[in-house]
Regions:
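Histidine-centered catalytic micro-motifs
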Residues: 89-96
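Metal-dependent catalytic neighborhoods of phosphoester/phosphodiester hydrolases
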Residues: 77-78, 101-108, 138-143, 147
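A general structural detector for well-ordered alpha-helical segments in enzyme core domains, enriched
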Residues: 48-52, 78, 110, 114-118, ...
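Active-site flanking residues adjacent to catalytic metal/cofactor-binding acidic residues
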Residues: 18, 91, 154-156
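Short catalytic/ligand-binding loop motif for oxyanion handling, primarily in non-cytosolic enzymes
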Residues: 24-26, 73-75, 97-101, 136-140, ...
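Active-site beta->alpha N-cap acidic-glycine motif
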Residues: 2-88, 130
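Active-site-adjacent pocket scaffolds in enzyme catalytic domains
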Residues: 2-4, 120, 124-127, 131-182
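Alpha-helical scaffold elements lining the catalytic groove of polysaccharide deacetylases
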Residues: 98-120, 180
């Protein structure tokens, strides 16, 4: 999205991104609502995504939707609706597991299964990834190697601040390419 000012200054680029996950999948609820019970909770995504897509269309805004594989598996038509509206569909992992809770093998399987499912649904390559809760932190640089090996071209997981459970304080604040085992 590009916005211009009335005073003649150059336009500013904005990135509009959405994490597509159910309300009961956020980390704050992980001890109250285990994954084994997710399917028993009512979905609120269909209405929310439809409303958001209508609003974005009205304002001629295009964005990237980081879709959880679990959601895509249960609501493939919602994922198709996002793609048909001209938005990018990217991966948010499959199970909403934070990267720092997984081994490299588990991380690879999670991103691989999510990417394959999303590509099957939308019929086009999925090149973007965002870890749940911005959970790629210092010490997890191996995640970038795996993302590159699995065919991702960019990552949107780094939050350049320090917080208790997320943040990568020395991360670049501008868009940049990911490389092998470095940020």
């Amino acid at each position: 999205m590009v916005t211009a000012s009335d005073d003649g200054t150059p336009p500013v680029r904005h990135f509009f991104t959405v994490d597509v996950e159910e309300y009961f999948q956020v980390n704050a609820f992980e001890h109250a609502i285990p994954r084994s019970e997710w399917a028993s909770w009512p979905s609120r995504l269909e209405h929310a995504i439809t409303t958001l897509l209508e609003l974005m269309d009205r304002h001629r805004t295009v964005g990237t939707f980081f879709v959880l594989g679990w959601v895509a598996d249960r609501l493939p038509e919602v994922v198709r609706q996002i793609a048909r509206a001209g938005h990018e569909v990217a991966s948010h992992g499959f199970w909403h597991r934070r990267a720092f809770t997984m081994s490299p093998v588990e991380f690879r399987e999670d991103v691989r299964s999510s990417k394959a499912l999303l590509e099957d649904i939308v019929g086009q390559p999925v090149i973007g990834f965002r870890a749940p809760s911005f959970s790629i932190i210092p010490g997890l640089e191996w995640t970038f190697d795996i993302l590159l090996e699995e065919g991702f071209r960019y990552d949107s997981s780094l939050f350049p601040v320090h917080r208790r459970e997320y943040g990568y304080p020395r991360a670049a604040r501008d868009p940049h390419e990911i490389g092998r085992a470095h940020v």
